[in-house]
Amino acid sequence: MKIVYVNDIVYGYATGDPLAKGGAERYGWYLTRALAAAGWSVTVGVLFALREGEERVIDGVRFLGIGCRTHFLMAWLRFLKAERPDWCFWQCADALWGPAAEIAKWLGVRTAFSTMHDNDLQLRKTMSKRKHLRLPYAWGLRRSDVIFIQHYGQREYLPSHWQRKAYLLPGIFPLPDTVTPHHERTETVVWMAVIRPGKRPDLLIEIARRLPTIRFVVGGAPSLSHWDAGPIEQIMTQLRSLPNIDYRGHVAPQQALKIIGDASLFLSTSDGEGFPSVFLEAWGAGTPVVSLQIDPDHKIRDCGLGMVTETVEGTIEAVRSLMALSERRQDMGIKSRRHVGEVHSPVAAVRAFETAIASVSASWSPGRVKFPVAETHSKENL
């Protein structure tokens, strides 16, 4: 079975680029690598980081420069015609998914969309700054053969007639062989995210200010397009000036894992997510998560992987109490690693992926045309 995907940042993660960032793209790398290890033929199209026609294979995943001489959709069409995949894969809300899915269906390629945020499936909330592009994106969801969800709560956001094609695809994090015991850790609370309004860095600052004896390590660069000038300047000034905040700016992926693995707690102040990949990174490192709101499928509460606090006051109390109890953190860390190993391993994700594919393939019928031989390599037809 062959699957294709287009994403330059996935290539960045695969090559160890320290500038790579984005939970969706990091997951895209883990998933494509896991599928390749399971015997899938996986090709990731790269628009800019590789020259057109240049190839590189990393951990079984083939990266191919596809160029973008005119418009992405033309590159997509050429890519699908040349590769002849069984499936194409797409992540995150994007107006291009509508026409991209339609092109794939026309060529007889099955379509899999993977949601990476709850808002991806809430059409009245998604793409709030580009509302006029919601319709083509919604068309892409309609034309998707499979919609992968991160947690079961996301299924409820879909219209009832789309819910039957929604399948849970668990996040992936390869467990490190060893972790640092909590009694040997650095006694820090780590907060790691791209700094944008939905991550609520203002709440992080308030919590840190009210816990002056606890050290916070903060990683992440601001996403300036999401902010007005005044608020982000104030946020950054406070992050750099509070004496108990160690602000690191953008942190390379491998260094971020080390910081999380050395910390006593991971703090989430976000008010909207899907299933944060950084939760898996924390749990895999044996670091409990203290989350103000986010708790997909109630995993933190039900499995003892940290604490869900609901209020700033509750967060302050949870951080204060857990920082004083290394044995309790150690117990939570053991449960966290066990949970990741059982539910979020590459093997578990591939099993879920293939179950969904098999269910759809049994009832699937092809689109208008299946890779006409006469057109496949004809530049005149492109």
Would you name each region that the model predicts?
Residues 288-291:
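Short hydrophobic beta-strand element within catalytic cores of glycosyltransferases
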Residues 93, 271:
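Aromatic "clamp/platform" in nucleotide-sugar-dependent glycosyltransferases that forms part
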Residues 230-251:
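Nucleotide-activated donor-binding/catalytic signature segment of Leloir-type glycosyltransferases, i.e.
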Residues 154-173:
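Helix-loop-beta element that forms the nucleotide-linked donor phosphate-binding surface
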Residues 4, 181-199, 205-211, 217-219:
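Conserved donor-binding/catalytic core segment of Leloir-type glycosyltransferases
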Residues 106, 130-147:
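Membrane-proximal helix-turn-helix segments that form the acceptor-binding/catalytic region
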Residues 321, 328-343, 349-355:
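A short, well-ordered alpha-helix in the C-terminal region of glycosyltransferases
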